[in-house]
A protein has these predicted regions:
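Conserved AdoMet/S-adenosylmethionine-binding subsite of the radical SAM
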Residues: 1-122
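C-terminal accessory extensions appended to soluble enzyme cores
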Residues: 128-160
């Protein structure tokens, strides 16, 4: 289907990059132009476990998602080595009744890492519980993406 429908973009999110090679089509090569694959890493442990595997895979369009972002995550070593191969990094807080905290400082730190290596960055949503400075905000579901957009925390790639 993905090979046939080149008029569509396919977007997949995984937390199991080690299973990527299972069921790949024979003509995958370096990936199809219309397939985007994202790997999640919610904390430093998972980033260090998943990203070395994910970033070595033959995928044309790769993105990293810190979602839900549950702590500070340093991905500089991955951005330094693979930055030109990463389409973007996305961060967002956790949703749900028992959502864990997302801290503005963690989001800003990740954005700064991306800026340093010229990798696009997008802050998708605050999550249900968002900390900025000493204040913790409990944000209704309908406002989580709106509040993230109002924060204007993003970085675009420099033109080639």
């Amino acid at each position: 289907m993905m090979r046939i429908r080149t008029d569509l973009d396919f977007f997949f999110v995984t937390k199991r990059p080690e299973r990527f090679h299972i069921s790949l089509p024979e003509d995958w090569g370096e990936g199809y132009k219309n397939v985007h694959i994202c790997c999640t890493s919610e904390n430093q442990y998972m980033a260090d476990k998943r990203l070395p595997v994910f970033l070595e895979l033959p995928i044309r369009h790769k993105s990293i998602i810190h979602g839900p972002m549950l702590g500070p995550i340093n991905i500089e070593r991955y951005l330094e080595k693979y930055g030109k191969e990463i389409d973007q990094v996305v961060c967002g807080g956790e949703s749900g009744d028992e959502a864990r905290l997302c801290d503005y400082a963690w989001v800003m730190d990740t954005m700064c890492q991306c800026v340093k290596y010229e990798v696009p960055f997008h802050f998708k949503q605050t999550g249900a519980n968002f900390k900025r400075g000493d204040q913790i905000y409990h944000i209704p579901r309908k406002d989580r993406q709106i509040q993230a957009a109002k924060a204007k925390i993003f970085a675009e790639a420099k033109p080639a």
